[in-house]
Regions:
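Active-site acidic catalytic loop and adjacent metal/ATP-binding pocket
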Residues: 31-44, 49-50, 82, 175-222
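Active-site activation/catalytic loop segments of kinase-like enzymes and analogous catalytic loops
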Residues: 221-256, 271-288
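An alpha-helical support segment within catalytic cores of ATP-dependent transferases
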Residues: 7-18, 136-137, 150-192, 202, ...
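ATP-binding pocket architecture of kinase catalytic cores
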Residues: 43-137
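A glycine-centered beta->alpha junction motif in the catalytic cores
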Residues: 99-112, 153-157, 276-291
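Conserved NTP-binding catalytic cores of kinases and kinase-like/nucleotidyltransferase enzymes
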Residues: 1-86, 203-205, 319-321
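ATP/Mg2+ or Mg2+-diphosphate-binding catalytic cores
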Residues: 142, 276-321
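A cross-family kinase active-site recognition segment
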Residues: 111-165, 185-187, 292-295
Length: 321
């Protein structure tokens, strides 16, 4: 979450008048995140999150994102609930942006989660996959494997503060990944961005999954690979197989992985690391120096990519047949 677009008091008052959610007590921008502008809105009835969708979000995708949250919350998954105004509408206009109000979830995120939190998120991801099985709105993964080569080709010019051969090395890795990508694995709706900052906890209890704005229809086990990449490397950059085995065990208590999914896990982890390396590398070069949100260092995911490249098999993640 972040703030790019600022809201004037009168604009917020006009927006809130459309809802039956009580009187405004306070509102404040939320600094974390990279995609949209987010505000915490506190009224006499409850707390809410107001999201203003920025230019990187395709408005044609908003019915998918809103619909997926509605569908999953109705199925009992802990996630934000979109709030309807007095006419039943969810999408609004505020400060020149399309906007939506969703319920506020208690809890905080943890950059380096413990084992208990890993178990909770592994179980929740499986529930996400199962509960979304009958969702009917489709969305292609705009950052799926077919986008990686064009994205790398678009990264031109000098790469400040990074090894100069990094582009060539990434191209070699990418060629290998794409040549063997497991397209035939089971597919469904995935979160695609379930980093630790998108899971909220009170102590070790998961209180909600947030930020559905990369959600799409793709390989289910790829979603697990994104999770392993973002949850299982410790502060010293070492891979924590205890965390990964905990996530995988908790996931499989809800949804068993097929043998093909298990065998493909190292490749899927390589692909997930490549996806985040490339998007971070692009932002590293193309983000203006005075940008509100600073780009994340792509070398974190390049190091993860190299780890997965040496993984002998699914057992490297604590997964045995």
């Amino acid at each position: 979450m972040a703030v790019y677009t600022h809201i004037e008091d009168d604009e917020l008052a006009t927006l809130l008048a459309r809802y039956d959610i009580g009187e405004l007590l306070s509102f404040a921008g939320i600094a974390e995140g990279v995609e949209n502008s987010n505000y915490l809105v506190r009224t006499t009835t409850a707390h809410y999150i107001l999201t203003l969708y920025e230019k990187r979000v395709d408005e044609a995708d908003l019915p998918f994102f809103i619909g997926l949250m509605e569908h999953l919350s109705a199925k009992g998954l802990q996630c934000p609930v979109p709030i309807q105004d007095k006419t039943g509408a969810i999408l609004q206009t505020c400060a020149g942006r399309t906007a939506a109000m969703v319920s506020f979830l208690d809890g905080t995120s943890h950059r380096f989660p413990n084992r208990e939190k890993c178990a909770a998120v592994g179980s929740a991801l499986a529930q996400f996959h199962l509960k979304s099985d009958d969702f009917t709105i489709m969305r292609h993964n705009a950052l799926g494997p077919e986008s990686w080569a064009p994205l790398l080709a678009s990264i031109t010019g000098d790469i400040p503060d990074l090894p100069q051969d990094i582009r060539q090395n990434a191209a070699s890795q990418l060629t290998d990944i794409l040549a063997t990508w497991p397209h035939a694995l089971p597919r469904g709706f995935i979160h695609a961005d379930l980093f630790p900052n998108n899971a909220l906890f009170v102590k070790d209890k998961l209180t909600g999954i947030i930020d559905f704005y990369f959600g799409c229809h793709d390989i289910l086990a790829y979603d697990l690979a994104v999770l392993l990449n973002s949850w299982c490397f410790d502060a010293d950059s070492s891979f924590n197989v205890t965390k990964s085995s905990t996530i995988l065990s908790a996931y499989q208590e809800q949804r068993l992985l097929s043998d093909a999914e298990k065998q493909a896990l190292p490749l899927l982890c390589r692909g997930a690391a490549m996806r985040f390396f490339l998007t971070r590398l692009y932002d590293w070069i193309n983000t203006p120096a005075d940008a509100v949100v600073k780009p994340l260092n792509p070398m974190e995911y390049y190091a993860k990519l190299r780890f997965h490249d040496t993984a002998p098999g699914p057992e490297a993640y604590g997964l045995w047949s």
